[in-house]
Amino acid sequence: DKLVDEAVSVTSRRYLTADVHTPWQIFHGLLALRHNFKLKINNEKSSAMKWVQSGPSYQGLPLIEQTVHGGRFHPFTVPYAFEGHPNQFLAILSMSELPRNFTFRAGNGATITVDDMLRNAQAECNDREEVTWTLWSFARYMHPGTQWNNRFGEPWSMERLVQTEVGKRVQEGACGGCHGLFALSLARNAYLQSGFQLQGAYLDADMKIKRYIAETRAYQNADGSF
């Protein structure tokens, strides 16, 4: 679409600056432009992905931390600084189709991989926090039948993550619930692509997705706007 291409072209000419703009801002640029996103670093334009890999810090705090269970991006501190939701940055980077052995440098100098971050996310998984971005990440990297125990010994699975997200009210979700519906769509699509017939939590997810597609279309104007 010409308008989409024009929007991408215009946006690509806006450069954020490392150490000025926050990791939260920079990661949203990565969500849109992925490997093509560039930052201003010391007045030169450089790959934002390589900047993330290099283990930078923001306001004295490391972007990437080594943990007992693997690694993670720095969790929430204040709004719009680091992650706004558990595993948000991992979910964003999953859209760039990074391999599981893709490496990052942690603040302590350790080498952390995508797989390390996935393992930490499994260990920290719980139903007291948002699971949207965890589901988003796992749907990109894990088989729909994956099961594990978190660090408290509680049993989890991809299906339980899907069911937890299905049970959340769309209106109460971040950004009007669109992220939750997107995560459910990723998980449902991966389930179907693995050769399964929709059933259980995945059937519930499919019904919820279709319901809100229908509701959205009902509010759409003839010119495509809302």
Q: What are these model-derived regions, one by one?
A:
Residues D1-F226:
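Preference for long, amphipathic alpha-helical scaffolds in soluble/luminal domains
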